[in-house]
Structures are given as C-alpha cells and as structure tokens.
Regions:
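Helicase-associated low-complexity/disordered flanking segments
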Residues: 1-43, 59-74
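Conserved P-loop/Walker A NTP-binding site and adjacent catalytic elements of P-loop NTPases
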Residues: 37, 42-173
Length: 173
C-alpha cells in the first residue's frame, strides 16, 4: 500500500485508537479548557480532587492534541508523552488502566517503565514511569528530548525526587 505520508524505509505508523472520555469525570467536563491551556502555555498545572480523572484522562487528552509518537508527522522526530508517578505500583497500574480505556494491549500505545520492568514497545506513545526513572534519564538525555510532553503527577507529595525533577525542569525550560 502506497501512503502519501509514509517515509521510505519505515514501517507504517499504527492508527490512533478511539479515544473517549467518561462524562462522569470532572476532567472530562473541563477538557476543552485544559486543552486550550496546554496549547497556549509551556507549563500547565492541573488541580483537582482525588478521582477527578487527572491521572487517567490527561494522557489521553495529550494524544488528542497531537502529542506523542502516534501523532508524529513524516520526517518529524517521534517523541513520547512522559507521565511520572511516585511509586512503581502506581506507574504500572495507571498504564494498565489507560491501555484498557483505549482498548489496546499494554505496551502498544501506553506502557510503563519502572525499576527492573519495562513494558513499552518502540511504537508506544505514552510512557508511565516513576519520577526516579525520569531523573535517571536526565543523565543520558539532559534536555529530555525523548519527550514532547511531561506530566508530573502527584507533585504535591514533595518527595526528594519530585523536588529535584521540578527544579531540573525549570532549568531546562
């Protein structure tokens, strides 16, 4: 099949999965407002109650805004949507939840990387990880160029890793 957007010598990109937003979640009701803020600003802080959908819906919203590898145009460097969680169990369970909501296998569109476990394919667009994993990546990718979007979840917990990470991000922005 000859696609006009195909880059010679590369495999065709898989299509974006159907993305839906549960109407019962407050973040779903405010997604247009959040999307406008993300388009207009380099840094956006989203606050909401526990259970409002921030953790599971924001990565999906970023996909609809054209972020992540699945949205990369031909000749454009494909980058990830990075999403940190303070704990390994949270990173893996959130990745599974988002993959389930997208009706895709874990690792295909959404995966995770934690200490001793990496459940990401090369085609994945959303990478859940601990904040320690992202901090470690600054050693080999100081400008974090592997990412076009970073979601620092649970930043209010103010762990040493999160504080270092937020300070580091402030310096490179």
């Amino acid at each position: 099949m000859n696609r006009p957007d195909a880059v010679p010598g590369t495999a065709p990109r898989p299509p974006l999965p159907e993305i839906t937003f549960p109407e019962a979640l407050p973040v779903s009701a405010r997604r247009d407002e959040i999307a406008a803020a993300v388009r207009a600003h380099q840094v956006v802080i989203v606050c909401g109650e526990t259970g409002s959908g921030k953790t599971t819906q924001l990565p999906k919203l970023m996909l609809t805004l054209g972020r992540g590898k699945l949205n990369a145009r031909p000749g454009q460097r494909a980058r990830l949507i990075g999403h940190t969680q303070p704990r390994r169990i949270a990173a893996s369970s959130v990745a599974k939840r988002i993959a389930d909501e997208l009706k895709t296998p874990l690792g295909a569109v959404v995966g995770y990387k934690v200490r001793f476990q990496d459940r990401l394919t090369r085609e994945a667009s959303v990478k859940l990880m601990t904040d320690g994993i992202l901090l470690a990546e600054t050693q080999t990718d100081p400008l974090l160029e592997a990412y076009d979007t970073l979601i620092i979840d649970e930043a209010h917990e103010r762990s040493l890793n999160i504080d270092f990470l937020l300070g580091y991000l402030k310096q490179i922005l």
